[in-house]
Regions:
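The beta1-alpha1 cofactor-binding region of Rossmann-like NAD(H)/NADP(H)-dependent oxidoreductases
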Residues: 53-63, 96
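Active-site loop immediately N-terminal to the catalytic Tyr-X3-Lys motif
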Residues: 92, 139-145
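Substrate-binding pocket helix/loop in short-chain dehydrogenase/reductase
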Residues: 90-91, 98-100
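Conserved NAD(P)H cofactor-binding loop of Rossmann-fold oxidoreductase domains
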Residues: 82-87
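Active-site helix of classical SDR
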Residues: 114, 150
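Conserved glycine-rich cofactor-binding loop
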Residues: 12-13
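Residue(s) in the substrate-gating loop at a strand-loop-helix junction
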Residues: 134
Length: 165
């Protein structure tokens, strides 16, 4: 039986890291991805397949998808979007560029990644997209405005995608 392949973003620590190891132990072909080369090397040394990918870089995303599809021979069972980061501080003190950076990682990068894997999933007639957002996409917290906003946007985007698929 062929192993099911799952691509997980944001695996350098936390939920992505833990899920990657747990799914690997359950005999999934896990392809992890991280932004930093040192994290990629660390995960590889732990026995996981890991590729470098930066959600703020369109070329990096495209290369990561191409490498993922090569590794799984075009048969991707699931995409687990988890990679994100959060800025703290009052909204009135937040420069527009900082807000744009937050959305580049937490919304636009996820959008591009999903748009690039969907054709493969459609071709194979199946696929799953798991979006690990945050409770802060439903209930705001002060001094987390940039993160809150990106997660609220992601929740709306994900609900719309679900309806369209």
């Amino acid at each position: 039986m062929t192993k099911k392949t799952i691509l997980i973003t944001g695996c350098s620590s936390g939920i992505g890291y833990t899920c990657a190891h747990a799914l690997h132990k359950q005999n999934y072909q896990v392809i992890t991805s991280c932004r930093n080369k040192k994290d990629v090397e660390r995960l590889q040394s732990e026995g996981l397949t890991c590729i470098e990918r930066d959600l703020t870089d369109k070329t990096s995303i495209s290369l990561a998808v191409a490498e993922t599809m090569r590794l799984c021979q075009g048969n991707l069972y699931a995409l687990f979007n988890n990679g994100a980061y959060g800025q703290t501080g009052a909204l009135e003190d937040l420069p527009v560029d900082a807000l744009k950076e937050q959305f580049e990682t937490n919304v636009f990068g996820w959008h591009q990644l999903v748009c690039e894997v969907l054709p493969y999933m459609r071709k194979q007639g199946q696929g799953r997209i798991i979006q690990n957002s945050s409770v802060l996409g439903f209930a705001a917290m002060k001094y987390r405005g940039a993160y809150n906003s990106s997660k609220f946007a992601l929740e709306g985007w994900t609900d719309t995608l679900r309806l369209e698929l």
